[in-house]
Amino acid sequence: MAEQEEKQTRRATAARKTQETDITISISLDGTGSSSIESGIGFLDHMLTSFSRHSGIDITLQCQGDLVVDDHHTVEDIAIVLGGAITEALGEKRGIRRYGWAMIPMDEALARCAVDLGGRSCSVFRAEFSRPLIEGLSTEMVEHFFTSLAGSMNANIHIAILEGRNTHHKIEAIFKAFAYAMKDAIKVEGNAVPSTKGVF
């Protein structure tokens, strides 16, 4: 019963307002993968919608960013706020698997992602993109998104593209691999903190 009650409360809302962005994100870790994403960047909306669907995490995201400058502040701050919301929703992380990994194909592209939610912030990203921009998103910001997310979540995120040519396919495979890795890592299997320390 206690485990069920904890799962039902794994929801959070996080916000950030600066002179560059105004962002509010609400999530439910035990959702159905439904989402409403309005980042102002079409391709980022597509990727976050895909992440929500495949992870099972419900996400509502509203962002007003200084896109007249570029997409840097918007992408970075969305990652910071999303990471904060996930951290808050996880609470003490009792009973979670903690670790998750996935290898996902998207046509000729193949992405691998491994996640550790144990409180140690680290991001390793190995991918190259032939296009500098795709549907409003600077492809160099994909790595920065996951670096910022790992820092905000205090998570260890390893991402690598093993095969691929098409930029769209490679980035979409990355977000889907991250989704399935997170889906595993946040699963509740008991009530203990998954660490020999007893705490994170």
From Swiss-Prot:
One of its GO terms (cellular component) is cytoplasm. Coiled coil: none annotated. GO terms for molecular function: imidazoleglycerol-phosphate dehydratase activity. GO terms for biological process: L-histidine biosynthetic process. Disulfide bonds: none annotated. The keyword Cytoplasm applies. It catalyses: D-erythro-1-(imidazol-4-yl)glycerol 3-phosphate = 3-(imidazol-4-yl)-2-oxopropyl phosphate + H2O. InterPro entries: IGPD_sf, ImidazoleglycerolP_deHydtase, ImidazoleglycerP_deHydtase_CS, Ribosomal_Su5_D2-typ_SF. Pathway: Amino-acid biosynthesis; L-histidine biosynthesis; L-histidine from 5-phospho-alpha-D-ribose 1-diphosphate: step 6/9. Keywords: Amino-acid biosynthesis, Cytoplasm, Histidine biosynthesis, Lyase. Its EC number is 4.2.1.19. SUPFAM superfamilies: Ribosomal protein S5 domain 2-like. It is found in: Cytoplasm. Belongs to the imidazoleglycerol-phosphate dehydratase family. PANTHER family: IMIDAZOLEGLYCEROL-PHOSPHATE DEHYDRATASE, IMIDAZOLEGLYCEROL-PHOSPHATE DEHYDRATASE HIS7. This is Imidazoleglycerol-phosphate dehydratase. It comes from Chlorobium phaeovibrioides (strain DSM 265 / 1930) (Prosthecochloris vibrioformis (strain DSM 265)). The lineage of its organism: Bacteria, Pseudomonadati, Chlorobiota, Chlorobiia, Chlorobiales.
